[in-house]
Amino acid sequence: MCPMQIINDNNTLLTVATANLLNLALPNRSYYENRDPYKPVQYEEKCNWLGAQFARLDADVLAVQEVWDADALKYAVRQSGLHYSSVLVPGAENGAQGTPRVGLVTRLPVKQVHSIDLF
């Protein structure tokens, strides 16, 4: 996990962090053929650990990779005890298929989300 701080002209601090969540998926969900799904206990441990890391970072914007299920990211964020206005994982609202997605967790208002998949 890598935090970065930006100070704008108004002397306002914005903290941005990025993290690879290593196949964050709901329990009992098969995400790769050669990988066993998370058992409920493993899922809980992973989300608790991620929540603790998110709390430590306390970022205004958190960009994450390897999310299979939007609900799994939402749960991990809740474990942090922090309040975010948006937890977004375009393409994984009902579970990503074939490949994990990226997510955005932010305290800033989000007006619109547009996924670019033509590459």
Model-based region annotation:
Residues 101-119:
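A well-ordered secondary-structure block
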Residues 80-87, 111-112:
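Short helix C-cap/helix-to-loop transition motifs enriched in small/turn-promoting residues
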Residues 1-80, 90-94, 99-100:
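N-terminal, active-site-proximal structural segment of metallo-dependent hydrolase catalytic domains
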